[in-house]
Amino acid sequence: MAINLGKDPNILILISFAEILFVLVPSLIAAKIEKNPFIVEVKELGFNVKNSKLKNILLKIFAGILIGILFFFISQLLLTFYMRFIIQSLFGAQFIEEGIGNAISTSPVNPNFIQLSLLIAIQIVIIGPCEEAFFRGFVINKSKHKVKLIYSIILSSFLFAIYHVPPFLVPLTTIITFFGYYFTFGILLSLVFVSFKSSLLPSSIAHSSLNILLLIF
């Protein structure tokens, strides 16, 4: 059975605030284990903008927007590639239909102007930054000191994909149908994060821009 979180835009808005836990929980746990102040752990996620020049911040924002737009244009190509050329070839069209039919939908149904504006603002302020803080800032930054960076990126992308097709909420058909799509975007966002020297700003803006474009179009 499909889970339609967007059926009531107001509920979708409220649920979105839960993503703040992606920042609070790992920071609290890390602060407890490593005996660091909570704020230090938050900054280590990539939120530290100390000594950042306005020009650099604006360049990162601009780069993030451009990358997000690029991601939007390749998103449908990626989805088509995985579904038609891989999943359908291996499991058949019926498998994909079941996978799509049981997916979690976060597309708001008939939102009014205020609801749509709030959802866009939430993408910018909460969804993008909080997901990037955990999957990139926390997972990559904490694991890269123990394993090779490539393994940190793979771990981050795997967790990112699993979060979007959670095994305890969707069937195996949905996981297999969409896993490659989300895993690929996990890799791409990780590369953005690493390329900008572990700054959350570009990957967060790219993530938010992609989500907003998918929300609108």
Where on the chain are the PLM-derived regions?
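Juxtamembrane helix-loop-helix connectors linking adjacent transmembrane helices
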Residues: L5-I11, V40-I127, H145
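Alpha-helical transmembrane segments of multipass membrane proteins
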Residues: F22-P26, I67, F71-L79, S156, ...
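Membrane-water interface of transmembrane alpha-helices
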Residues: V25-V40, Y82, I86
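Transmembrane helix-loop-helix hairpins at the membrane interface
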Residues: F113-F217
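Alpha-helical transmembrane segments
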Residues: M1, D8-L24, F62-G68, I153-L159
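Helix N-terminus capping/helix-initiation residues
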Residues: D8, N36-P37, P171
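Hydrophobic membrane-targeting alpha-helices
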Residues: I29-I33, F73-Y82, A161-I162, L191-S195
